Design a protein with these regions (language model features):
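Beta-alpha junction/loop-to-helix N-cap segments that form part of ligand/metal-binding clefts
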Residues: 28-31, 54-59, 73-144, 154, ...
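Extracellular/periplasmic Venus flytrap/periplasmic-binding protein
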Residues: 97, 141-143, 149-254, 288-289, ...
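Short, polar/charged alpha-helical segment
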Residues: 54-77, 194-201
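Periplasmic-binding protein-like
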Residues: 102, 106-115, 135-137, 178-183, ...
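Segments of small-molecule ligand-sensing domains
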Residues: 304-314, 325-379
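Extracytoplasmic "Venus flytrap"
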Residues: 35-36, 40-64, 86-93, 115-116, ...
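Short, low-complexity disordered leader/linker segments with a strong preference
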Residues: 1-41, 72, 387-392
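Extracellular/periplasmic periplasmic-binding protein-like sensory domains
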Residues: 247-318, 373, 385-390
Length: 392
C-alpha cells in the first residue's frame, strides 16, 4: 500500500519523513459553495479535570500542536483544521453525552478521544449510529475497536501488554513467583487483569488480587492483606492518582517490596508523586529517547507548552490528528464526509511520532512493549523492544 510523507515529520526532521501526510498545500479538494476550502472541524474528548487530568491536558496540547503545524503549512489540500475539546472528567456517562453532541453536529467530521476504554466503549454505539469516526489515542480494551467500523485506537491492546507484564517483567526480568495485584474496579482494569491472569497461569505465577472503587483514598486494609501473603512484587493496575497513593501507603507502612504498575506509562507526574520512584517498573510501547534528536526536540517543545514532560499519551493524541489529516489527503478532490474519512483511515498505512500506525482489520494498532524504570528521578529503558521478541 502506498505510503505518504508526513507533514509532522517534515516539521520535526527527516527521520519521520515517510508517514502521515503529503501534499499539504495542494489546491485540489472539496470546496464550499463560495469556492473556498472548508475548515474541517474535529471534536475532542478528554478528561481535563479529575483523576486523569494530566492525560487530558496532554491530549489537549497534543491535538492542538498537530493542528497548528498542519494549518501553518497551508492545511491539507487547502483545508484548515480546528478542534473543539470537551472535558469528559474521566466519566463514561459524561463522555457519551458529549460524544452525542458532537455526533449530532453535522459540521464535526470526526471525534478524537476519549482517554479510557470504558468511555470509548460507551460511545461506540453512538458513533456507529451516527456514522462518525471515534479515534482514541489510548483505548486499549481488546473488544473496543471491533465494536464498530467507526471505532479506532492507536495505543495497542491489553491482550498483548498485560501478558507481556506477566511473562517478561514479572517472570523473566524480576524472577518473581508470588504476585500481589491491586486493581481499579473498572472495565479497563478488568480487561488488564483477565489478560494478565491468562498469561500468569501459563507462567506458573501465584497471584492474589484485590480491587478498589474509583475515588478510594485509604488503601491500608488492602496493603495489610497483601503484605500478609509475603509476595515478591506489588502490582497496581490503574492510570490515576491511586497508583502513587497505593505505593506511598505501602512505603509508609514500612513494606519493602518491588513496585510494578500497568497503566500510567512513563508519567513525570507519577515520579513527582511517589516517595520511592526508583522502585517502580512499568510497561510502555514507546519512550522519548534523549539520544533521538527528533523525539527529544518533540518532547522539549511539548514540555515548554505543557509544563511537564510528555508520555506516550499526548504523542498518540498528536499522531491521531495527523491520521485524520492523512485520511483527508487520501480523499483527494473527493467530498470530505464522515464516511469518506472512515474508509480512508481504515485503509491507510502511516508512520508517526510513536512509530508504525497501521490499523488491523479491527481498527486498532499492534504494538511492541519495553520495560521502563526510574533512575535518579528520570525514566529510563531497562529492556528494549527486543526483550519480548520471541513472543508470548
Amino acid at each position: 500500500m502506498k505510503r505518504f510523507k508526513s507533514m509532522a515529520a517534515l516539521a520535526l526532521s527527516a527521520a519521520l519523513a515517510a508517514g502521515l501526510l503529503a501534499g499539504c498545500s495542494s489546491t485540489t479538494g472539496a470546496k464550499t459553495e463560495a469556492g473556498e476550502k472548508s475548515t474541517i472541524k474535529l471534536g475532542g474528548l478528554a478528561p481535563l479535570t479529575g483523576n486523569y487530568a494530566e492525560y487530558g491536558k496532554g491530549f489537549q496540547i497534543g491535538f492542538q500542536k498537530a493542528i497548528d503545524e498542519i494549518n501553518a503549512k497551508g492545511g491539507v489540500n487547502g483545508h484548515k483544521f480546528e478542534i473543539e475539546i470537551k472535558d469528559t472528567q474521566g466519566d463514561a456517562v459524561v463522555s457519551s453525552n458529549m460524544a452525542t453532541n458532537f455526533a449530532e453536529d453535522e459540521s464535526v467530521m470526526a471525534i478524537l478521544g476519549d482517554f479510557t476504554s470504558g468511555a470509548c466503549k460507551a460511545n461506540a454505539e453512538i458513533v456507529d449510529r451516527y456514522g462518525i469516526v471515534q479515534l482514541s489515542p489510548t483505548a486499549s480494551a481488546p473488544d473496543y475497536a471491533n465494536m464498530s467500523k467507526y471505532c479506532f485506537s492507536i495505543m495497542g491492546r491489553q491482550d498483548v501488554e498485560a501478558p507481556y507484564l506477566a511473562k517478561y517483567i514479572l517472570k523473566k526480568y524480576l524472577g518473581a513467583q508470588k504476585i500481589a495485584v491491586i486493581r481499579l474496579d473498572s472495565e479497563w482494569a478488568l480487561s488488564c487483569y483477565d489478560n494478565f491472569m491468562e498469561q500468569a497461569e501459563k507462567e506458573g505465577l501465584d497471584v492474589t488480587a484485590e480491587k478498589y472503587a474509583t475515588g478510594e483514598k485509604d488503601f491500608s486494609s488492602l496493603i495489610t492483606k497483601m503484605r500478609s501473603i509475603d509476595p515478591d512484587c506489588l502490582v497496581v493496575m490503574d492510570q490515576g492518582d491511586a497508583v502513587a497513593a497505593i505505593f506511598n501507603q505501602a512505603d509508609a507502612a514500612g513494606w519493602d517490596i518491588q513496585h510494578v504498575s500497568l497503566g500510567p506509562g512513563t508519567s513525570e507526574q507519577l515520579i513527582n508523586q511517589l516517595t520511592t520512584p526508583d522502585n517502580l517498573i512499568v510497561t510502555s510501547p514507546f519512550f522519548f529517547d534523549e539520544n533521538n534528536e527528533t523525539l527529544s526536540n518533540w518532547a522539549e517543545s511539548f514540555e515548554e507548552e505543557a509544563g511537564f514532560k510528555p508520555t506516550i499519551h499526548p504523542a498518540c493524541a498528536y499522531d491521531c490528528v495527523y491520521l485524520i489529516a492523512n485520511a483527508v489527503e487520501r480523499i483527494g478532490d473527493g467530498e470530505i464526509t464522515r464516511d469518506a474519512i472512515q474508509q480512508a483511515l481504515a485503509e491507510s498505512e502511516n508512520e508517526g511520532v510513536t512509530g508504525a500506525l497501521n490499523f488491523t482489520p479491527d481498527g486498532d494498532i499492534e504494538r511492541q512493549y519495553m520495560i521502563c524504570g526510574v533512575k535518579d528521578a528520570k525514566w529510563v529503558v531497562l529492556e528494549g523492544f527486543e526483550y519480548g521478541a520471541e513472543g508470548l
